[in-house]
A protein has these predicted regions:
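Juxta-kinase regulatory segment immediately upstream of eukaryotic protein kinase catalytic domains
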Residues: 1-26
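Conserved ATP-binding subdomain of kinase catalytic cores across diverse folds
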Residues: 25-174, 248-250, 261-262, 266-273, ...
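ATP-dependent phospho-/nucleotidyl transfer catalytic cores
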Residues: 27-31, 52-53, 59-63, 118-134, ...
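Conserved active-site aspartate in kinases
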Residues: 241
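Active-site activation/catalytic loop segments of kinase-like enzymes and analogous catalytic loops
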Residues: 251-294, 311-330
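Small/polar glycine-rich anion-binding or flexible loop at a beta-alpha turn
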Residues: 302-312
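Long, compositionally biased intrinsically disordered regions
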Residues: 353-356
Length: 369
């Protein structure tokens, strides 16, 4: 896609029902790497809005994407209103186009959408303290609980088979068989690690197929920076970045948060001796999450959360190693073995989780372990 200039941005802004002429800042806003995000505001007001160009190379069906987001946010707003909350602040609000649509296609074929800007909030890029991690957990759990009665099967898959771990395993096997760059001979321990966990990769989907755990509306990208906190109080306000909201398992969202938050190292740490899964942070997050989501979950689903932590971490490592075998085409790299370092970090975390897995189960399901 072409770079977004001020004229392109202003032309897109003019398509939305902002209530008047807009001032547009063509500098990117935030930390996101997929969509192009900008802040715009009305010329005579200080009220701000988010204007985004959707990356249609990643999200090929913007109509389905926005149908998901509109349906989920309308449901959330009704729940928040009924609970006495502030839906204008506690949920993303989609701004329609002047014709009443949820998104706009410009003359270049680019898809755009707009939201109210949620003022006086911050998002964390890393876990600063236990209290913040618990707050993020409570906010994500509340999001899950409020969507517990939403018909998940009506949602579009915005990225097909995104958390289908057996499919990720199959893609790895194809990359290994092709061995396009001849790298397989240098990573025998990592290959053996994945092969030894083929059976594990099926655990969650087997539980879903057997009817032991339910299909849910899931966020599928539950990094801590996708939760807005009140700038003054630190209270959890709103879950953002809803592009990957689609049918899934609660274990996916729980597990991805643990993968990214319950350790004290960078995702691409080259020194594996510095990689440490923090069981205490896992417990902090689990208790926060279950305090708001637990009421709508069965014992079997609670137990699946521990598996979610293991499998989302394993799956991510498989994806990194697959990309390494294929020539580093998907994930951006800053050094030759970057994806290999990423994969090794994930596998170290998996190994450490396996060592304390009984304790992980006990934490999420103390009454039925």
């Amino acid at each position: 896609m072409k770079p977004v200039t001020e004229p392109i941005l202003c032309a897109a802004a003019s398509a939305f029902d902002f209530g008047g002429p807009m001032v547009c800042d063509p500098h990117h806003y935030g930390e996101g790497h997929i969509n192009d995000t900008f802040v715009v505001w009305r010329a005579e007001h200080t009220k701000r809005f988010i204007l985004q160009r959707i990356n249609t190379a990643t999200f090929t069906d913007p109509a389905g994407l926005m149908e998901n987001i509109c349906g989920v946010t309308q449901h959330l707003r009704a729940k928040i209103q009924a609970e006495g909350g502030d839906p204008g602040r506690e949920c993303l609000n989609v701004i329609p186009t002047l014709s009443g649509a949820s998104y706009y296609i410009d003359t270049e074929g680019n898809a755009w959408r707009a939201y109210d800007f949620v003022e006086n909030t911050i998002c964390l890029q890393q876990v600063g303290c236990e209290a913040d991690f618990r707050t993020v957990a409570e906010t994500l759990g509340k999001f899950q609980n409020q969507l517990a009665d939403y018909p998940a099967s009506t949602l579009h898959e915005t990225i097909a088979r995104f958390h289908d771990t057996p499919n990720r395993y199959a893609n790895f096997e194809k990359a290994l068989a092709a061995d396009a760059l001849g790298r397989a001979k240098t990573i025998a321990p990592e290959i053996a690690f994945i092969h030894a966990r083929k059976k594990d990769s099926h655990v969650l989907l087997d539980q879903l197929t057997a009817g032991e755990i339910p299909l849910r509306v899931t966020h599928n990208d539950t990094k801590i920076n996708n939760v807005l906190l009140d700038e003054a109080t630190g209270k959890g306000i709103c879950v953002i970045d809803l592009d990957t909201v689609m049918p899934g398992l609660s274990a996916y969202d729980f597990g991805d948060s643990i993968r990214t938050g319950a350790n004290d190292c960078a995702e691409d740490e080259p020194d594996q001796s510095k990689v440490h899964f923090d069981l205490h942070l896992y417990e902090v997050f689990a208790k926060g999450y279950l305090s708001t989501a637990g009421a709508s979950m069965s014992m079997a689903e609670k137990k699946s959360l521990a598996w979610g932590a293991r499998l989302m971490t394993l799956e991510c490592g498989i994806r990194f190693l697959t990309d390494y075998l294929e020539g580093d085409h998907y994930f951006h790299i800053a050094r030759p073995d970057h994806n290999l370092d990423r994969a090794r970090t994930q596998f170290t975390l998996v190994r450490q989780m396996e060592e304390v897995f009984d304790q992980m189960l006990e934490i999420v399901c103390p009454d039925n372990h």
